[in-house]
Amino acid sequence: MVKYMNLIVLGMLMFGVFVTLSLGSSTALTVYSPFPGEHVALINPKELILNISVYDPIAPVNSTVGVTISGPYDIKMTSAGVPVGELNSSHMLTVTDYAFPVTLFEANGTQISAFIPGQYNVTISVAGCSETIPIYVISPNEIEILVCVYSNGVPLPGATVSIYNVTNGELLLTNTTNSQGLAELTVPYVYTMTNEYNVTAVKPGYQLVYKEVTVPADHITPVTVKLTTKPITFVLTPVYFQDMGVIEPAEPAQLPGTPEPVYVASAYMGTTFSIIINATESGMPVQGATISASYLISGKQMSSTATYIGNGQYNLSIVLPNSTVPYDLELVITGTYQTNTYTFITLLSVQPNFYCEIQRLQSEVSVLESEVDQLKVEIQSLNETLTLQASEIASLKTYLEGNVSYFSMQISSLESEIKYLNSTLMTLSSELTTVNSTLTSEVNSLTSEVNSLSTQVSTLSTEVNNLNTTINNDNQKISSLTTLVYGGIILGVIALIIAIVAVVLVFRKVA
């Protein structure tokens, strides 16, 4: 093994000499370590540990190899350089794990207390020749992950890349791909053990893709991850959540192992929770999509259907029941349009509705206060009435007590009068009976008289007829008498008849 290593080193040296001579360079110094862009783990912030390997076929044997280091934020050495060794007989120097203490460095004239991650420049000098090598000092507790996102073989810019800890699902970092479809993320890393990450990428209009990445212990170079996604023609994008007039923007929060986008929202018990959703196909608003949510409440499967509100937007409303709070709902929202289907998840945290409860209690308190005020008025009115009635009762009692004897005398007097009236009534009743008997006798007598008069009237009527006959005979005999004489006779007869009738009527009335 050592033999092969020596051959490899010798070959590298000869290649370096060949390149140096062929280029006609003025220096033959070749630096093998550190190499440009090398990542160096900062295990101890108090010292910077490097591997130094150089070769210079022109420099004399035993030439001193010096190292000068500068870093970010104007970090530099306090001296012109540090000798790390001498070239051996093969014109080489190889030093492993050479430690540069922090006491050799300053920043802006002040000695630093610890190294910080960043880009450092290592300048190696041998016999008047030097080479500057850029390196990256990284924290051993961090690892850089380079995520390249492609769609149809073309880099996809604007994709959101997220890295999660597989063990606990914690979101570690999020970044967006650049124009080359690349996102650089530096995440926590435990260099003493194997680390597992879940890398996801998503962009509106594209499928969410993810990949689990395993990084072994003591790994210091960047980890490259390639993700390939496909366009989605039909997409549902929640715009905002609304509950009790409060609007909450909808922000995606992808969870490891879930291909659907996940959104987190909160609402209050006993209210109507709404999700405003954009439905697009190839970026254009869609009307006629069917969007519904399914969820479990107290073990019962429930569902709600969204209504179209215009411009490709839909309102999905859910009535949150009164239950033991707080409680959580997982809303699985699925939309279909033609042959396309899209699904996302909303995790809803339902909290107690203290506002409505306070309003309800305030309303009840107001009603009770109003009723109490009304009762106070009624009680005051009753008290006044009772006081007045008590006064009247007292006055009436005094009046009655003072007039009992008077009323007793009046009652006795009334009883005497009633007895007198009863006696008088008895007398009047007896007299009335007597009068009635007398009147009955008189009526009977008058009736007899009327009958007699009727007979007389009949007789008189007969006589009148006879008289009329006589008069007619006389009229024939006495034609020379004037009309006036005849009229007087007729009037006399009529007056006699009227007198007789009047007498009859008087008797009937008396009867």
From Swiss-Prot:
This is S-layer protein B. Residues 358-392 form a coiled coil. It is a single-pass membrane protein. It is found in: Secreted, Cell wall, S-layer; Cell membrane. It holds the Pfam family HMMR_N. It comes from Acidianus ambivalens. The chain crosses the membrane at residues 487-507. Induction: Constitutively expressed.
